[in-house]
A protein has these predicted regions:
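Short secondary-structure boundary segments
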Residues: 43-44, 125-126, 190
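Extracytoplasmic/periplasmic substrate-binding proteins
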Residues: 96-163, 199-206
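Mature extracytoplasmic/periplasmic domains
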Residues: 151-152, 156-212
Length: 213
């Protein structure tokens, strides 16, 4: 058994007071990196956020449709993503430390942005930027953005083990996690993307979500 309890989405962010431009695709990102040479980077793979960013670069350049039914052949996949890999190689010289090394993880990159070493960052928490502005971690002029074609996202699931000793109780807990009330509270305190269908909520329930700033 499994059920969704939250969603996540890759976002990028910059400070509009320092960099008024907001790259909307890989081509604009390259020009952005050239203009702010040494001030752009991403977490080293296999960091979760860094990996998502690289996958997003791949999808933005070569699309994702061709991979749906592609045979599990490493060479075929490598050939398909080569244009994106070539782009990353072209991008490298303009990155922090000329792309020779990368921040070891997302929090390191985030601190570099806060300290002014970088003019751009990225996060897998869609509302994390807003939360960081609210608590003073980020400047009030920091803004989040996505590419025009969108960014990678996923749904998080909670599951019941096949050998669970109390399936009924686990279902009750899951139902509670999926309830509009708990989803709204998670949205408010954890800034996670809710899994509820907004169109099916009552007016009172909708107001609970609408009132979250």
């Amino acid at each position: 058994y499994e059920a969704p309890y939250g969603k996540a989405q890759l976002v990028m962010y910059n400070d509009s007071a320092i960099t008024p431009e907001t790259p909307k695709n890989t081509e604009e990102l390259l020009e952005f990196a050239k203009k702010y040479k040494g001030k752009v980077t991403y977490p080293a793979l296999p960091d979760f956020t860094g990996s998502a960013f690289v996958r997003n670069i791949i999808y933005d350049i070569v699309g994702h449709e061709q991979f749906a039914n592609m045979p599990e052949d490493k060479e075929k996949v490598k050939e398909a993503i080569e244009p994106a890999l070539e782009y990353l190689r072209e991008l490298n010289p303009y990155l922090w430390n000329e792309g020779k090394t990368f921040p070891d993880k997302e929090p390191t990159m985030k601190n570099m942005y806060i300290d002014g070493e970088l003019v751009m960052g990225m996060s897998y928490a869609a509302f994390g930027v807003a939360a960081n502005i609210e608590d003073g971690t980020f400047s009030e002029t920091t803004r989040s953005f996505q590419f025009d074609k969108g960014t990678i996202g996923n749904t998080n699931y909670i599951a019941i083990a096949g050998n669970s000793g109390n399936v009924a109780a686990a279902k009750v807990a899951i139902n509670e996690m999926m309830s509009p009330e708990v989803q709204a509270e998670r949205y408010k305190t954890l800034r996670t993307i809710p899994v509820v269908d907004y169109s099916k909520l009552s007016d009172e329930q909708k107001k609970t979500f609408d009132d979250v700033n």
